[in-house]
Amino acid sequence: MVEEGANKTVGAPTVGDDQQPKEFVRPPFTPFQDILDAFNYLMWNPEANAIAMPVLILLESIAMKFIQNKVSYTEIDYTAYMEQIWMIQNGERDYSQIKGGTGPLVYPAGHVFIYKIFEWVSDGLENISEAQDLFRYLYVITLMIQFMCFGLLNIPPGYAIFAILSKRLHSVYVLRLFNDCFTTLFMSLAVLVMILCAKYKIRGFLVLIGSSFYSMAVSIKMNALLYLPGVLLTIYLLERCNTFKIVLNLAVMVIWQVIIAIPFWKEYPWEYLQSAFNFSRQFMYKWSVNWQMVDEEVFLDPLFHRSLLISHVIVLVVFLFYKLIPTNMNTPAGLLKIGKANLLHPFTDAVFSAMRVNAEQIAYILLVTNYIGVLFARSLHYQFLSWYHWTLPVLLNWANVPYPLCVLWYLTHEWCWNSYPPNATASTLLHACNTSLLLAVFLRGPANSKSGDNETTHEKAE
């Protein structure tokens, strides 16, 4: 006998007498909640960068063109740059003799290379608008590079938006034409490449490219040297403590400095070094944004300069041992052990570095090192804001404080940079802002990496 139900398809749905098809229920109409959800997504979800960042770049491109067309160009240093270029074009190679309306040439040869191009583009001083166009493009390209860094670091759009809000920064680029903007371009590229190396565990050639970009930044203006401790530590970690590869990166940096300055090295090497890398150069007190709370006599005193340098080194060392260096290396014994391994195995890689250092830690090393240098800078002029403004969205995100406080901090910081002329109130507030943010990043920012048990284990270089 065939059992009842044997012919029924297994798993076929059946509807009993008491079962009815479910009635379709429309989702609730909650437009305000939907708007709030969309706002929260666009502000706080890093995935929304794919939407927000292209829009912000487009808006900035439009804004920069509007500023260029509606706000008058302000002559500060561009004429002096051109006068210096004309002296070089007329055959002068002694850096100590190259001068412009605002004083002697005090920037390395990368600056000369770039402004030779601008002399051709703008026909000297005849077509300043052509130079402004290039600086407008430079601003947008630099912003794109910086947004790429933000994306790799998962910085939410709510913080990334701080990168485009500075009135002073817009002026520095398209209305002033300062060389600081090109240093920022190459420094941003260097940071981007280093972050990529850490995120995707890429070594070798790409690290060399990052080192090259860094050297290019230094060859335009010395402020990039504020990154130097962080760059050296980054190379050390990315190259897995391989002594040979580290030296190779350093050699690439030096080679670029030599190549770009060949016309001046050949005839007046000492004059070039003394002028292009003059660490004792005095700054003008009246343009110092950060030290108006002290007297001019103090500002110019070498003892004040030395105290700033000592303070810079002390804070840097504290960060190195508590936040930057991997935890199993930040003791004398750990440093001695890894140093010995470097000497005994100069062509091999320490395993722990590549396994433990991530993109966020590399960015922390680079950005915080620069920010410490800014805090203790002997002088900050208005154009120097470009040195570190682009890092503020990342630092504010790392500070891990309520967003309204970040907004208040940023508005206060921006007021300091737009207060004209420089004054004691703005200088004091600027130091309060930068010190508080650095402290927050120290206490609440990303932790330093922890190396594994095999901290000095080496493997053959790939």
Swiss-Prot record:
Q: How does it sit in the membrane?
A: Multi-pass membrane protein
Which keywords does UniProt give here?
Endoplasmic reticulum, Glycosyltransferase, Membrane, Transferase, Transmembrane, Transmembrane helix
Compartment list = Endoplasmic reticulum membrane
- Report one GO cellular component: endoplasmic reticulum membrane
Segments spanning the bilayer are 145-165, 177-197, 218-238, 244-264, 307-327, 357-377, 391-411
Query: What GO terms are given for molecular function?
Result: dol-P-Man:Man(5)GlcNAc(2)-PP-Dol alpha-1,3-mannosyltransferase activity
Classify the main location: endoplasmic reticulum
Q: In which pathway does it act?
A: Protein modification; protein glycosylation
Which major enzyme category is it? Answer: transferase
**What's a Pfam family in this record?**
ALG3
- EC number(s) from the headed UniProt entry: 2.4.1.258
Cytoplasmic-side positions? 166-176, 239-243, 328-356, 412-462
| Top-level division of the source organism's lineage | Eukaryota
The UniProt catalytic activity note for this protein reads: an alpha-D-Man-(1->2)-alpha-D-Man-(1->2)-alpha-D-Man-(1->3)-[alpha-D-Man-(1->6)]-beta-D-Man-(1->4)-beta-D-GlcNAc-(1->4)-alpha-D-GlcNAc-diphospho-di-trans,poly-cis-dolichol + a di-trans,poly-cis-dolichyl beta-D-mannosyl phosphate = an alpha-D-Man-(1->2)-alpha-D-Man-(1->2)-alpha-D-Man-(1->3)-[alpha-D-Man-(1->3)-alpha-D-Man-(1->6)]-beta-D-Man-(1->4)-beta-D-GlcNAc-(1->4)-alpha-D-GlcNAc-diphospho-di-trans,poly-cis-dolichol + a di-trans,poly-cis-dolichyl phosphate + H(+)
Taken from the record's topology, the Lumenal segments are 1-144, 198-217, 265-306, 378-390
Q: Which residue ranges does the record annotate as region Disordered?
A: 1-21
Q: Name a single GO biological process.
A: protein glycosylation
Record's function text:
Dol-P-Man:Man(5)GlcNAc(2)-PP-Dol alpha-1,3-mannosyltransferase that operates in the biosynthetic pathway of dolichol-linked oligosaccharides, the glycan precursors employed in protein asparagine (N)-glycosylation. The assembly of dolichol-linked oligosaccharides begins on the cytosolic side of the endoplasmic reticulum membrane and finishes in its lumen. The sequential addition of sugars to dolichol pyrophosphate produces dolichol-linked oligosaccharides containing fourteen sugars, including two GlcNAcs, nine mannoses and three glucoses.
UniProt-listed PANTHER family: DOL-P-MAN:MAN(5)GLCNAC(2)-PP-DOL ALPHA-1,3-MANNOSYLTRANSFERASE (PTHR12646:SF0), NOT56 - RELATED (PTHR12646)
**Family, per the entry?**
Belongs to the glycosyltransferase ALG3 family.
| Name of the protein in its database record | Dol-P-Man:Man(5)GlcNAc(2)-PP-Dol alpha-1,3-mannosyltransferase
What is the originating organism of this protein? Kluyveromyces lactis (strain ATCC 8585 / CBS 2359 / DSM 70799 / NBRC 1267 / NRRL Y-1140 / WM37)
